[in-house]
Amino acid sequence: MDLITGIKERRSVRRFADKPVPRELITEIVEIARYAPSWKNTQTARYIVVDNPEKIAALANDKCTYGFEFNIKTIAKAPAVVLLTVVEGRSGFEKDGSFSTPKEDRWQTFDAGIAAQTFCLAAYEKGIGSVILGYFDD
């Protein structure tokens, strides 16, 4: 697949096949996603892979999804969930600790979005459907 085709064809997938995704494949996708650009190359994105059915079920609740019932159903049926987190206090800062711009430390939100899209495109290339659910804030 070429990049333009992947960008045009990749879709959010909320109905997943009833089979596990090999951990090795998820790891490969994460490794590719780590090449996503970030503010001043701070590389703040971190990935947590959840492929244990009991732990996935624990994520599929009102508290984690802020009551979005559709997200609860999507998570509950997923064979794996990848949580994208960021390292706080690195993006938007100079080496002396001062802010680089008036956006202060909010660059990590942009970096997380870039990393999430890169992950989804890599997953698509590997034949794995994905959807971005932005519901955790803590």
Locations of the language-model features?
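Specificity-determining recognition surfaces
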Residues: 1-27
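Helix-loop element at the rim of GNAT/NAT acetyltransferase active sites that forms part
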Residues: 9, 35-36
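Glycine/small-residue-rich phosphate/adenosyl-binding loop
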Residues: 41-113
